[in-house]
Amino acid sequence: MSEKVIDVQDAWRDRALIDEAKYKEMYEASVSDPETFWGEHGKRIDWSTPFSKVKNTSFAPGDVSIKWFEDGRTNVALNCIDRHLATRGDQTAIIWEGDDPNESKHITYRQLHAEVCRMANVLRNRGVGKGDRVTLYLPMIPEAAYAMLACARLGAIHAIVFGGFSPDSLASRIKGCGSKLVITADEGLRGGRKVPLKANVDEAIKRLDKDLVDHVIVVKRTGGNVAMEPGRDVYYHEAAEQVTDECPAEAVEAEHPLFILYTSGSTGQPKGVVHTTGGYLVYASMTHQYVFDYHDGEVYWCTADVGWVTGHSYIVYGPLANGATTLMFEGIPTYPSNSRFWEVIDKHKVNIFYTAPTAIRSLMGGGEGPVKKTSRQSLRVLGSVGEPINPEAWDWYYRVVGDSRCPIVDTWWQTETGGILITPLPGATRLKPGSATLPFFGVQPVMVDAEGKILDGACEGNLCIKDSWPGQMRTVYGDHERFEQTYFSTYKDLYFTGDGARRDADGYYWITGRVDDVINVSGHRMGTAEVESSLVAHPKVSEAAVVGYPHNVKGQGIYAYVTLNEGEEGTDELRKELVTWVRKDIGPIASPDLLQFAPGLPKTRSGKIMRRILRKIAEDDFGSLGDTSTLAEPAVVDDLIENRQNRQNRSA
């Protein structure tokens, strides 16, 4: 595909925090002398005991250890709430937009302080203190943020489990971190449908040792009739009436754990990613400010769920540490109509909008009409997160949503990294659709070949990071050996991201997908993202997912799942046309061997495509699909199985 370059517009540069020259100067300082750079920027948060040590990190085999600001003491809630009260107590901290468009509320910093203190006192009355783990299984309601910050206030460690996880998944995570207390809601609301959260908690607890969970706190969201276990369960509003709205914040060490967040391993049990207090907050707040070019008084909206790391870093901790107004959205982009995102932007005068490529692609399928009937004049910066954004979706987002006047920050990072690692900066970086562009301050990407040799210049290979940054995860909860094995054993002295990438002649990075999303066709390595981008460039295609499957001749064949735009029909003619299209675009080696038209793709409710399921169906092995409870629409799996193209009695 021809490479398009978008220059930094004067309007972006004129009001940006930094320009290209300043970025280069700061980046050079951050990698040549990280001690001085982070020693200075570590002061962006308040410390009850100032740090004297900045960086103490090692990626050495058998001795992986990551510590930042280790002799300092601070408290995250103090930094996200209390320090703002004198100057911005009456400013809105959180705008909550309900699933129902008629339901929304503004919570000021002063109100947030009172609510968080109340929640902290409710927890403290039930024995929660420093170092205790608390599991949160909540919908996107303000109480989710209150609970996170209440745990932080007490020095307790929160472990959020996304509301789409099944009782089995929830049970394994409660057990994994040893939570004695669970906070949930009677029911969640998403797209007009109810989600039985409390019932799922009850089911999960039945699978655990009887004496593990002592308390379940239930937030009343729908008022639905739910079973309450006497002595164990309590409604939050009743417990909150018994406590005051003042609660001192516990100063904790910089390396005290703030949260555990489980992420899927490529094998076996999910990993409990541990993030700590000081370095994480410095990095989350700094990336939020510079990546989104956040200015005081702006309204910022990240559409993620707090069940995922994006919600932790860029709905709650980063924005609130910066005294921002952050929007929390309970609903989905298509309810009650495809205009919902854009209507919310107009309603709350959103300036910065951060969403996932999968949401953009699904809305693209409905055409420009639902976007163009709204104004979106308040928008200034657009962001993308979660997976590489294909150039066609990037272009639609830029042109249709942003009216070609808003920069797009295509951010690359991971649960493990705590914050954004590779990204454009609005006033400093020329944009290339589909490229995450350049590293953030302190981040040193290196490209490595399969043998572990570091590659120079323009190249393609495995993406690693050479040195630590403050937001980096510290360990896998209860299993440091697994941490070393997963991230540091593949390439000596490097953090291996698990992603492949291409670096172009300008030093820009293009993420090509997980290394396990690489297909080896007749000895040729190919990132699935490239084939997907080609398919989505076809005018009739809304979305595509590509996986490998065993092929008698080639080793692996290419299996493409394609969702068409509204009104298009999946004919044999179109199937042939799409195969020819890819062949012409990338070359014969990239031609899909099998192509299945799919009304929908299996996605988690955060919008990630579940490629594991697609691989199994492509392999005609759908008896072992694993846990599909996190899917937004489990029914799509049945359709995919019914119409699979690789039944064993068919020729490949």
Curated annotation (Swiss-Prot):
CoA binds at R190, G191, G192, R193, T310, S522, R583. Keywords: Acetylation, ATP-binding, Ligase, Magnesium, Metal-binding, Nucleotide-binding. The keyword Acetylation applies. One of its GO terms (cellular component) is cytosol. GO terms for molecular function: acetate-CoA ligase activity; AMP binding; ATP binding; metal ion binding. One of its GO terms (biological process) is acetyl-CoA biosynthetic process from acetate. Acetylated. Deacetylation by the SIR2-homolog deacetylase activates the enzyme. The modification N6-acetyllysine is found at K608. Mg(2+) binds at V536, H538, V541. PROSITE patterns: AMP_BINDING. Its cofactor is Mg(2+). It is an enzyme of class 6 (ligase). The keyword Ribonucleoprotein does not apply. Pfam families: ACAS_N, AMP-binding, AMP-binding_C. ATP binds at G386, E387, P388, D410, T411, W412, W413, Q414, T415, D499, R514, R525. It catalyses: acetate + ATP + CoA = acetyl-CoA + AMP + diphosphate. Its EC number is 6.2.1.1. It comes from the Bacteria. InterPro entries: Ac_CoA_lig (IPR011904), ACAS_N (IPR032387), AMP-bd_C (IPR025110), AMP-bd_C_sf (IPR045851), AMP-binding_CS (IPR020845), AMP-dep_synth/lig_dom (IPR000873), ANL_N_sf (IPR042099). Belongs to the ATP-dependent AMP-binding enzyme family. Catalyzes the conversion of acetate into acetyl-CoA (AcCoA), an essential intermediate at the junction of anabolic and catabolic pathways. AcsA undergoes a two-step reaction. In the first half reaction, AcsA combines acetate with ATP to form acetyl-adenylate (AcAMP) intermediate. In the second half reaction, it can then transfer the acetyl group from AcAMP to the sulfhydryl group of CoA, forming the product AcCoA. NCBIfam families: Ac_CoA_lig_AcsA, PRK00174.1. This is Acetyl-coenzyme A synthetase. It comes from Methylorubrum extorquens (strain CM4 / NCIMB 13688). The lineage of its organism: Bacteria, Pseudomonadati, Pseudomonadota, Alphaproteobacteria, Hyphomicrobiales.
